[in-house]
Amino acid sequence: MTIVPVSEIPTVSLLYHLRKLVPATFKNEVDAPKPSQSFNDRIALIRGDITKLQVGAIVNAANNSLLGGGGVDGAIHRAAGPGLLKECRKLNGCDTGSAKITDAYELPCKKVIHAVGPVYSSRFVNESAEDLAGCYTTSLKLAVANDCKSIAFSALSTGVYGYPSSEAASVAIKAVKNFLEGADGDKLEKIIFCTFVPKDVDAYNHWLPRFFPSTEEPETDDWEEVEAGESAENGPVAKEEGISTTEEAKVALPDVPTAEPTEGGPATKKLKPSDDDKKL
């Protein structure tokens, strides 16, 4: 599969321009966040295989052992080779809501950040959200501390850990925006949300415009909503023609590996998940 350079991963600004992301509408101006061209030029969204991204760091949806598991976790360990597991064995695990960093070995990125998201609990929604936000905030801090200029997140906790995709996307995007507004926010040149299954794709298509609104006036006549039952792989599509093949190529990536890992995962992760659960 083709390696994807960070420069070819579409930003929110580009997705708005290509009519791949629908601008949000707000009931009143008070509810609407202030648009930021700077933020929109640094936040990116793509659907595909996170192991093929040539970025500073990718964020693995890890478990507490950090020894590999199913879905994205297993795919990253397989693509990185045995060196990653060897280094992870020295880390003595990781607490839920936190993250640790390793080298990337055979992956095209420079570092792998292993974030341990929460198992979702409908009884402790606030605690789940706090732990999930902690994964994103800690990962961003680790990226900056290790001189990474770009970082790509998988959709943490939305697979077998049961976090509803829409709620998880909202927590993730809010945590990233809070970081951008902080003291170290200008130290990362690109922050990427890498999705794969349709429920995560739809969640980020919905929430990104609500935290990072378009800086241009929306032209509603140009939009055609994805029909029910269709995969919203690239979000809503434009009625107008003229988008170049090169621009289109930036919006899609090859499929993520789906085979189970050969070692390192706890017993619960050895169970074969459904298609929608092939990641944490």
Language-model-detected regions and their locations in the chain:
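Short amphipathic alpha-helices and their capping/turn segments at secondary-structure boundaries
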Residues: 46-50, 97-105, 139-144
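Conserved N-terminal structural segment that caps and organizes enzyme catalytic cores in eukaryotes
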Residues: 1-50
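Short, conserved "active-site rim" segments that organize catalytic pockets and cofactor/ligand binding
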Residues: 33, 37-96
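Structural motif
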Residues: 43-44, 56-58, 98, 110-114, ...
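Phosphate/ribose-phosphate-bearing ligand recognition and processing surfaces
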Residues: 120-280
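Conserved, mostly hydrophobic/aromatic
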Residues: 59, 76, 113, 153, ...
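Active-site alpha/beta core segments
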Residues: 86-119
